[in-house]
From Swiss-Prot:
GO terms for biological process: gluconeogenesis. Mn(2+) binds at residues 196, 215, 252. GO terms for molecular function: ATP binding; metal ion binding; phosphoenolpyruvate carboxykinase (ATP) activity. PROSITE patterns: PEPCK_ATP (PS00532). Pfam families: PEPCK_ATP. Substrate binds at residues 55, 190, 196, 317. Gene3D superfamilies: 3.90.228.20, Phosphoenolpyruvate Carboxykinase, domain 1, Phosphoenolpyruvate Carboxykinase, domain 2. The gene is pckA1. This is Phosphoenolpyruvate carboxykinase (ATP) 1. Belongs to the phosphoenolpyruvate carboxykinase (ATP) family.
Length: 525
């Protein structure tokens, strides 16, 4: 009798062949043999996820039980679903899996052994199992032998919910059950749902252990100094943390404990629309055999990749293990950060390319989480629009925003970290008339912030937003540092700045229990 690896404990009975922790090459072979994708000219496995090319936030639910009810910030992000609804759907899902070959990944989330969690992911598709093999932390043979998962994800894209029977909004569903330590995903092939489900789990569990979970990338300088880059999808977390002059800790999800910071993952999930070897050489070179390309156009005959094409989606992605980046820190841990960067892609074109924040301003802008929702990262978003995503990660935060803000604020204060706001969005006008901020200039400004060069320049307070804008920065033309100077008609800039300021005030009004010092640290003009 073949080994079932304990799947019967999940209610999965009579499966076909179960493949557990296959090596990368075997998963690629099987995916190709099953017609799940094709091999691109650089050796990466290229797949198409169908109509779901981004996360489906409106199809994500948390099972409402007495044990978690008072800990969850219920609402449009954390939608409740009953235990009965979950069990009904779960029963049909496990029946669907009977007779099917399944791919199991047993590994970990959390690079710090003190906080890492053993996880299991069960996949219907070989390519998705390759994805999680590359994205999470892979076990040693010894660790695998004694592996007991504390949380399990079952992902079956071919199984579709029936909304009128299952109580879902659509055929797609992502349901987190904290009591059962189980996540079920169906109806969508977008691999990011698995990654972000585990992130949400960590965001729920870690605050109880005194750890601040963060939607950020992190890197380390030659002297061991670390930096964090917060931001929503498409704002530059992966791009800016992959710096040949520094060592990459991780590109998306981290924890900040009393010992320092640690990566949750063992891989990267990079946006690759318009990727170029010139501007992002580390990411370009990391996409090779063993990597997964999601919804990237590949010529079916010559297999040449067209990174410029958004024919399938703007949200094209590449997944690869962190050690495909030559200067990655293994394991992904570092000391307490000296610099914290908040990234925003401002579609209004009024935010400066870089500004320094006081601690109170840092809390204001962290809670605000302003950016522009960029095309493709969520279904239905086809052009950028202003959005406020609390703590730069509202879709993944099950608890009250103040839980995360207090944890971060306490650590910034205790370790005296410098905080900067960096705009990777538009300058010279709003989206449509302005232009996207130059990546080389952004890199130069971030470099100046990290190496202390900005400590030596003069700053001037922004009359509307209050933060401090540098008058000079090495490697950057002085005229672009003040965004008002980049607009042809300054009165239009002033009107747009006032418009954005009013949106900030309107959004922040929902934070009733925030100290007055933080409320007053925001918009001033």
């Amino acid at each position: 009798m073949s080994n079932t690896y304990g799947l019967e404990r999940l209610g999965i009975i009579n499966p076909g062949t179960i493949y557990r922790n296959l090596p990368m090459a075997r998963l690629v072979e099987i995916a190709l043999a099953r017609g799940e994708g094709l091999l691109a000219s650089n050796g990466a496995l290229s797949v198409n996820t169908g109509k779901y090319t981004g996360r489906s936030p409106h199809d994500r639910y948390i099972v409402d039980t007495p044990a978690v009810h008072d800990s969850i910030s219920w609402g449009a992000v954390n939608q409740p679903v009953s235990e009965a609804t979950f069990e009904r759907l779960y029963s049909r899902l496990t029946a669907y899996l009977q007779g099917k070959d399944l791919f199991v990944f047993d590994g970990f989330v959390g690079a710090d052994p003190a906080y890492r969690m053993p996880i299991r992911i069960v996949n219907e598709y070989a390519w998705q199992n390759l994805f999680v093999h590359q994205l999470f932390i892979r076990p040693t043979a010894e660790e695998l032998a004694g592996h007991e998962p504390r949380f399990t994800v079952i992902c079956a894209p071919g199984f579709k919910a029936i909304p009128e029977e299952d109580g879902t909004r659509s055929e797609a569903f992502i349901i987190l059950n904290f009591d059962r330590r189980l996540v079920i995903i169906g109806g969508t092939s977008y691999a990011g749902e698995m990654k972000k489900s585990i992130f949400t789990v960590m965001n729920y569990l870690l605050p109880e252990q005194g750890v601040c979970p963060m939607h950020c990338s992190a890197n380390m300088g030659p002297a061991g100094d670390t930096a964090l880059f917060f931001g929503l999808s498409g704002t530059g977390k992966t791009t800016l943390s992959a710096d040949p002059e520094r060592y990459l800790i991780g590109d998306d999800e981290h924890g900040w404990s009393d010992k320092g910071i640690f990566n949750f993952e063992g891989g990267c999930y990079a946006k690759c629309i318009k990727l170029s070897a010139e501007h992002e050489p580390q990411i370009w070179n990391a996409i090779r055999f063993g990597s997964v390309l999601e919804n990237v156009m590949v010529d079916p005959d010559c297999r040449i990749i067209d990174y410029d094409s958004d024919a399938l989606t703007e949200n094209t992605r590449a997944a690869y293990p962190v050690d495909f980046i030559p200067n990655a820190v293994i394991p992904g841990v570092g000391g307490h950060p000296q610099t914290v960067v908040f990234l925003t892609a401002d579609a209004f074109g009024v935010m400066p390319p870089i500004a320094k924040l006081t601690r109170e301003q840092a809390m204001y802008y962290f809670l605000s989480g302003y950016t522009s929702k960029l095309a493709g990262t969520e279904r239905g978003v086809t052009e950028p629009k202003a959005t406020f995503s609390t703590c730069f990660g509202a879709p993944f935060l099950p608890r009250s925003p103040m839980v995360y803000a207090n944890l971060l604020g306490e650590r910034i204060a205790r370790h005296n970290a410098s905080v900067y706001l960096v705009n990777t969005g538009w300058t010279g006008g709003p989206y449509g008339t302005g232009r996207r901020m130059s990546l080389p200039y952004t890199r130069a400004m971030v470099r100046a912030a990290l190496n202390g060069e900005l400590d030596k320049v003069e700053f001037t307070p922004d009359p509307v937003f209050g933060f401090l804008v540098p008058k000079a920065c090495p490697g950057v033309p002085a005229e672009i540092l003040n965004p008002r100077n980049t607009w042809a008609e300054t009165e239009k800039y002033d009107a747009m700045a006032r418009k954005l300021a009013s949106l900030f005030r309107e959004n922040f009004a929902k934070f009733k229990d925030v100290p007055v010092s933080i409320q007053e640290a925001g918009v001033v003009g």
